[in-house]
């Protein structure tokens, strides 16, 4: 069986772009159990409530939902268990210094397979206030309306 190549997206966190101001992004590997990989290959995962945090000098992904593998047996994984993120030491140090600043957190943006290996894209993020969210929605609506008006003018 030939190896997979390219990027196959399993799950995206669309809510993160609405809830946070996103900064630097990093690609991290995931330390997974076999049944988790099989469940991901079926395209089953949810990143909505996920976040990453440091325990000691290691980075862990928490609250990401990967449901149990349907054909799994007694050795199935726990759906919301903590999963270790695999990054280079220099990246870990850089991220840890940035997350110590007030208000910064790490959120997963995308979970995918790259050349057969499970990867997660995490971003350094700062929470938006309610008025920021409303302002962003208002701006998106204004651009949609202006594009619609331009299209009608050009067609009509």
Curated annotation (Swiss-Prot):
<dbReference type="Pfam" id="PF01668">
    <property type="entry name" value="SmpB"/>
</dbReference>
<comment type="function">
    <text>Required for rescue of stalled ribosomes mediated by trans-translation. Binds to transfer-messenger RNA (tmRNA), required for stable association of tmRNA with ribosomes. tmRNA and SmpB together mimic tRNA shape, replacing the anticodon stem-loop with SmpB. tmRNA is encoded by the ssrA gene; the 2 termini fold to resemble tRNA(Ala) and it encodes a 'tag peptide', a short internal open reading frame. During trans-translation Ala-aminoacylated tmRNA acts like a tRNA, entering the A-site of stalled ribosomes, displacing the stalled mRNA.</text>
</comment>
<dbReference type="GO" id="GO:0005829">
    <property type="term" value="C:cytosol"/>
</dbReference>
<dbReference type="InterPro" id="IPR020081">
    <property type="entry name" value="SsrA-bd_prot_CS"/>
</dbReference>
<dbReference type="GO" id="GO:0070929">
    <property type="term" value="P:trans-translation"/>
</dbReference>
<keyword id="KW-0694">RNA-binding</keyword>
<dbReference type="GO" id="GO:0003723">
    <property type="term" value="F:RNA binding"/>
</dbReference>
<dbReference type="InterPro" id="IPR000037">
    <property type="entry name" value="SsrA-bd_prot"/>
</dbReference>
<dbReference type="InterPro" id="IPR023620">
    <property type="entry name" value="SmpB"/>
</dbReference>
<comment type="similarity">
    <text>Belongs to the SmpB family.</text>
</comment>
<protein>
    <recommendedName>
        <fullName>SsrA-binding protein</fullName>
    </recommendedName>
</protein>
<keyword id="KW-0963">Cytoplasm</keyword>
